[in-house]
Regions:
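Conserved active-site and cofactor/substrate-binding residues in soluble primary-metabolism enzymes
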Residues: 8-11, 59-66, 75, 139, ...
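Active-site phosphate/oxyanion-binding loops
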Residues: 98, 105, 163-179, 207-253
Length: 284
């Protein structure tokens, strides 16, 4: 069975790559991973035993859908794990905790459109017009959810099975995160996981989304977070460094949270690899 890992940015799977003793600038590395050709705006890797493929899509719907189309056509995985960072929408989650998505919600539009009343289409017979704002949802693959849940329980990894939400823009402030959690009954919010699951569902490929919490429900991300490029890699070091010089404490807390979330994802992958849950490491 072949497994595909999908994330939006290199930071989310950097530890997974580095634990394989592989670097993209080492042309003839004998490590676990090798780089593949990928669609413009994405980065793709593959384990040398061909058991696991990985694609970094970039953030947002358009990039995710384009990269997923390539992945499903080129790699044809048997199962997909959507991995990455997320903001908490409930006080029951701490930085570094994992959220196993039981149901994936998506809301179109901007934060001004997210009130549930605005998501109900106007009655066309009464002369109104259909609203563009929609609320959609996808159920997680039950078998994959059970497999991963069992693995994290046995290994003592902090996690929560819960619905998650995908929106079009970064949710940066604590007040909005808390409101989304209370309004829609979700525990985490991101920008990509719904689109990964939707593409996998159309192709008939089992998919599970696992998100690592990078900031709590009572925390507000630094303003710089909303100005970083959506590319899978590159273009973020300079702005982050400049912001860190001006606001060292805020940036130190943010980078520490990113490191905790990144390590949580890597720990999950180590557990899944060592337990051979998805036959990772075996030749097809």
């Amino acid at each position: 069975m072949s497994l595909a890992l999908v994330a939006s940015r290199r930071e989310e799977l950097a530890t997974v790559l580095s634990r394989g003793a592989w670097r993209p600038w080492r042309q003839r590395s004998e490590g676990v991973w090798r780089q593949r050709r990928a669609p413009e705006g994405a980065l793709a890797y593959q384990r040398r035993d061909h058991s696991v493929s990985m694609i970094l899509t970039g953030a947002g719907r358009a990039q995710t859908e384009k990269a997923m189309a390539w992945l499903l056509e080129t790699e044809r995985p048997d199962s997909i794990l959507s991995l990455g960072f997320s903001g908490a929408c409930t006080p029951n989650l701490d930085i570094g905790d994992l959220v196993l998505a039981t149901r994936l919600h998506h809301i179109e539009g901007s934060p001004f459109d997210w009130d549930p009343e605005s998501l109900n289409p106007t009655d066309l017979q009464s002369g109104g017009s259909q609203l563009d704002v929609t609320h959609e949802e996808i159920l997680a693959d039950a078998k994959m959810l059970d497999i991963v849940r069992g693995a994290v329980e046995i290994n003592g990894i902090d996690f929560m099975p819960s619905p998650t939400l995908t929106v079009n823009s970064l949710v940066r402030t604590s007040g909005l995160s808390e409101w989304l959690g209370e309004t829609y009954g979700i525990s985490a919010v991101d920008r990509e996981s719904y689109w990964v699951a939707a593409a996998a569902g159309r192709a008939g490929v089992p998919c599970l989304s696992v998100r690592a919490i990078v900031y709590g429900v009572d925390e507000t991300l630094p303003e710089i977070a909303s100005r970083l490029p959506d590319t899978p890699s590159g273009g973020r070091l300079g702005p982050i460094f400049k912001y860190g010089v001006r606001h060292p404490r805020k940036m130190w807390r943010y980078m520490r949270a990113v490191r905790s979330a990144r390590n949580a994802v890597a720990t999950l992958m180590t557990v899944l690899t060592n337990s051979d849950i998805f036959n990772v490491g075996k030749n097809p």
